[in-house]
């Protein structure tokens, strides 16, 4: 077994663009669930919408900044549409509506009726929309190696997307760090605990929940852009499973913490890569086909999610005394 | 010491008593200086009138007790007045402003702050965070201002000072950094009341402040409620235990089956046949208030225990 | 929502850990036994999988067929594929087909090694080699290299005539996993079509009701939104498939065994997982997230053993009968009759029997029910068993109705079940029945106006709209706040 190759690949997952995208999506979900107690089961919908908004605007010839703004606007409108009917209702309604809404985005996006806009189920190819992002890079084209990690500087799965991705993740963490310590974050924490109590103190709970939903959703849409930049916009790869992975990441790292989502994402992808690569090397393909190894990985994720939420709902970084898994 | 009536307290109580002297002891009686006036407030649950109040006024600066047997609709009436439930019909004004159909948060901002029967201390926040949350006019509660600490730090400092004063008054200052969930039931009641006071309300509405509180702390709570009145605040509180009420309230409103059946000063209400009927008729087993329980000797004993407990 | 706060002083209790470990072990053992008992199926694909790639939720395929200008397959041509997964190669087989399995979605650059194509053949569009295709997991993307004389006008016509990537399956997709029902193709609003779609909607709604009534009962008695209920439905279909196709039983005994085993999993789940969690005081939201993890684990276990493709419970073509303008298969008529009888039985159980009334009492007020001498845990056990059994029956009948079942057939319906339950009022069993019929009709009739592949979305839009105007559902009633 080639441990060097396996460990190098696993280490590559630590700072892969996908890891950054999932970390960012989990930061958004953390604002919903960790800070406010909102059960958003449709974070992948925000991501897909952001990805579509960015890609379609870019293909239409819009500059980079405008395409990003379109993604943000799409997520904002989506959050408002979801929040208006549900934020006054019980928490499980929001869960059902967000998961349904994310599914609607995916079903509409993959529908043949919109082929010209969204490319239907085959989606939008990356090189249709990644030029503006790659052109924004200050570096020269080519490849560059750091130790065993060699990637293109600007193209597709590049150093450039890694740098931008992790800078955005860092900024999002800084934002959460500021907000958690602010009076605004205190109101959210109160809402997570008992929204009636906060209402009785004169705070407009509905408005705060809406602000949290929009903010977390916008961060989710940026994560969507990050996620699709090194690949394609594929509606079926951004479905319910993606949301559940983000939840696992958040609960693994620790909800309501600043760095929990980042740590969770790194561990999630590294462990998954380790398990799959090792199995691929150890288990003969006559016993387990390669797709069965993939499926085995996801089975582990499902079981890990169950065990985590039962035995360590505060995750790695969380404080059990402070975390209430409450629905609003 | 809140349980010892101070001269100011006696004055305040006497002044309120004087103001209410000529008010007739009938349901819906008009008050000389009402802060809250409610008309035709009704709330149905599955065809049953949970609340059916024709008219009621609450005197400014007085402690008014809303009493009645279990299921009389007191809490529902409270929920309606504070915007936590919507009536089928009715309107009410608070300090001249109409508050019918206004959302709970805006009712609170209008100066009418409530507490809950089942204490809603925010258990996973510290006592100080609970207190700060009660404050108003904190610019940092705006999402964008929150990002610039310089904008909200000065106000935060003022809020913290105000909170520390209140905590000292409610003898919670030593618990400042403890999680609210670690406090005793009575301390949580005190915290909830102190937190409500952070907003400097005109009127405070307490839903069964004495429920589930041990006798020693009951005395201290009663003292705090009287002190609020002495500071000029209007207090409306729900209670179904009458002997708690008679020692501190200036005026008593009796509800049963959603209606107001009697009003008056405590002593007069206790002897009102409608009240006795309401209690005995509906709930024969309800303790009408065995005053032996709260005679002076017992009170003295409780007070001593209270002292020793500290 | 019932109290869903974590117990701050709660410490991990080893018995629960052991119990869960035991449960997982049990589950794993049973599926392993299943695997051992069915070597033909489980290992069948391996033999043929040397070249052909099967797309599933974790795998994407890049495929193509190479033919000479004369239409003969090109054998032994070598293709290089470079992308997120690194460098891969493929060789075309005797039919000219080649495929590459990727587990990392994204863009891949496919290069045809022109040195390996037969002499005298050339690429029709040399500018298109290498070409880039985007592939997602669960989809196949085609990279076609037409051979022949270079097209006139250079590369002007390289797009349009042949899509560079045309996915064939989308197993993660709800709509794609379920074949189109008879009569729903075609267009235009005609009376006959409306009649056909209405009947389809009623059938689909009735079958959906079998699944959603169980979901609603479980929610009603325990407060739990069970995201793994879809997998209970898939389980029924898959067990029936195992019975008919792998064990060789006739359909009816196989279906009965599937339902019985389905119900048994409900009993086991409550005994081994949910009851210990309730006793431990695990909050409702936590339990809901447990169901999400369970749903993920079970669905991939299905995929692990049975693959991502459709599984046909019966292989013979069903016979159809025509009633006026409406065509319906005899199997569907029987299914409808069975579903109606079973739903009637459930209604009788809830309204007419002591146990059923006790169940409703628990749903209404568990504390009061317990005080009246009803065993709350006993009732919850009955509800889990009943709900899982109903879901399994729904899975069998839905599998028959759509012609095939799959690892995802229940998962695709989960949101429609939630929509039905929410429409009917969360926790109201009869509401779930009414809600299912509405959802069935909405799904089928909406294809009169919107593309068929968006019809599931229409049901979900209805769900959101209903919440906007009547959050307590069609049959639910407003409850006292606070």
Annotate each predicted stretch with a short phrase.
Chain B
Residues 204-208:
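Catalytic Walker B motif of ABC-type/P-loop ATPase nucleotide-binding domains
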Residues 245-247:
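A short, surface-exposed alpha-helical micro-motif characterized by mixed small hydrophobic
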Residues 1-42, 284-310:
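ABC-family P-loop ATPase nucleotide-binding domain
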Residues 67-69:
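The feature captures the beta-strand-to-loop junction immediately N-terminal to the Walker
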Residues 82:
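Helix-to-loop junction immediately C-terminal to a conserved catalytic motif
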Residues 143-175, 223-226:
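Conserved ABC ATPase "signature" region
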